[in-house]
């Protein structure tokens, strides 16, 4: 029998936070955090995003801009929430009383988000331009200058990722990032969401935000080709003004990458997947447990497996009796071939070319 594709789009996405994971499914999101006492705290909330219900968010290339804004806002919110568990003891009481934050905290979060965007634009947009400009005396071709600028931008990003990876908290963040990907890959490959299955799933995923950032750099090289003005100020301003356009195009590419086996898309996905080797690390089982808790809070993976892979989960499989699942898998129509050895699992996943709809989550 010919081997069939065995991955399906699940609609879930998320991010790593301090000692935890945020998972989002449509408008619901859950933050699971391993508290200092070893317990797992799970907070379930709704996030409708900017311009909720507006038809503007359904327009291709425009929707990516608002998706990026939503990701920044929600990302800052859940990072602050997870950090509240590790504040100094004299602040623990007030943090526990209201971890969602009042209007004052929301205002501060908004300022921090804006400051982060400004800093990112300065480091990854403006700085590469001025560094590339130092070579103008040696390179006269504007197109080549745009390529050099893009290469410098990618180099700065890789240097940044590598540099912060030396920090203890970031090392653990990267491991939780790997746990997040493993959970999503586990269910999208049709495996029951058990600790064993999660640990043997891939830590790389094509819809990852790291891959999105690479597409941003790649698209910016192409668009910046067309900036043909003499004024330095105009060149910088045009680059900044084009960034929403770059984000919108990059979002559509990563949506396509998450559901297409087109050879060009696969090739374009490779650099982002390689960079993910730096931004994700192998988690331990305690981290995977946190990721599983976050997924289960927002996603009915048992129903998902039944709808997409055609089998019901036997609770005996959840007790570690994997042979029962193996026997069932041999007989069930549509069950995934999850018993193959994928412990290396650094290869890009197989994907169905079905349309995930407008709620596609970047992870």
Where are each of the predicted segments found?
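Polar-ligand-bearing catalytic/cofactor-coordination segments
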Residues: 2-13, 17, 21-23, 93, ...
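Cytosolic regulatory modules rich in charged/polar residues
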Residues: 50-54, 81-106, 330-333
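Hydrophobic alpha-helical membrane-embedded segments
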Residues: 28, 59-81, 149-174, 247-259
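Membrane-interacting alpha-helical segments
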Residues: 219, 223-230, 237-293
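Divalent-cation
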Residues: 1-90
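Hydrophobic alpha-helical segments characteristic of transmembrane helices
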Residues: 89-137, 141-167
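Juxtamembrane "helix exit" motif at the C-terminal ends of alpha-helical transmembrane segments
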Residues: 81, 85, 119-141, 216-247, ...
